[in-house]
Amino acid sequence: MKCPFCNFSDSKVVDSRPDKGGAAIRRRRECESCGKRFTTHERVEEVLPLVTKRDGRREPFERMKLVNGIQKACEKRPVSVETIEKMVDRLETRLQESGEREIPTTTLGEWIMSELHGVDQVAYVRFASVYRSFKDINEFMEELQDLLKK
């Protein structure tokens, strides 16, 4: 690991422990040249499937797109950032566990709606209105009636 102080390429690990939540390893390192200490965080490189768009294009999965879309649906709602992060964590885990190399946006959208349904029904309807591209008020009303039945 390159030292951030002198750019020397060798360092020794002085201390190693799990990071908060256990998703990473926090390591305290000491440069073998200048002797200064610095911290690194190591994470497992996750392989997530490609997202297949409605027009057939394929894009790498981007966590921030999910976070931004859910935050937009939850705007001015009593949904904490922590709750949104946990939702996205569950969705990423589901993606990994699916074992699929590609996932259609339709499937991903349904998963997001399922998560939102259990958290905030107004956010659910907001997301559904964009995701399902309602063409008129009748389609919107049908979604609301389905929501009330659940």
UniProtKB/Swiss-Prot annotation:
It holds the Pfam family Zn_ribbon_NrdR. Keywords: ATP-binding, DNA-binding, Metal-binding, Nucleotide-binding, Repressor, Transcription, Transcription regulation, Zinc, Zinc-finger. Residues 49-139 form the ATP-cone domain. Signal peptide: none annotated. It comes from the Bacteria. GO terms for biological process: negative regulation of DNA-templated transcription. Its cofactor is Zn(2+). InterPro entries: ATP-cone_dom, NrdR-like_N, RNR_NrdR-like. Binds 1 zinc ion. A zinc finger (unnamed) spans 3-34. GO terms for molecular function: ATP binding; DNA binding; zinc ion binding. NCBIfam families: transcriptional regulator NrdR. Belongs to the NrdR family. Negatively regulates transcription of bacterial ribonucleotide reductase nrd genes and operons by binding to NrdR-boxes. This is Transcriptional repressor NrdR. It comes from Citrifermentans bemidjiense (strain ATCC BAA-1014 / DSM 16622 / JCM 12645 / Bem) (Geobacter bemidjiensis).
